[in-house]
Design a protein with these regions (language model features):
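Short, charge-rich amphipathic interface segments used for partner binding and complex assembly
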Residues: 23-67
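N-terminal acidic leader/helix
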Residues: 1-37
């Protein structure tokens, strides 16, 4: 998924669509909060994946000009 997300983020950066990037970031942060509270299964791999995706989105946001 990370490569797909990299391409999506790159597209939104190219379009200068800060709102879409913030929406993706919020979704991933919510997902991470849910994964951390999961019991009965080992969510470490999913947590690592979502954390990596958050880093990708944050990097994309950092490349946009400040508002």
């Amino acid at each position: 998924m990370s490569r797909s997300l990299e391409l999506i983020v790159a597209g939104f950066v190219r379009l200068n669509d800060r709102d879409a990037l913030h929406d993706i970031l919020s979704h991933r942060q919510d997902l991470l909060r849910q994964l951390v509270s999961v019991t009965g299964v080992d969510p470490r791999q999913a947590i690592a994946q979502v954390s990596q995706e958050i880093t990708i989105v944050e990097a994309g946001l950092a490349t946009l000009a400040p508002e």
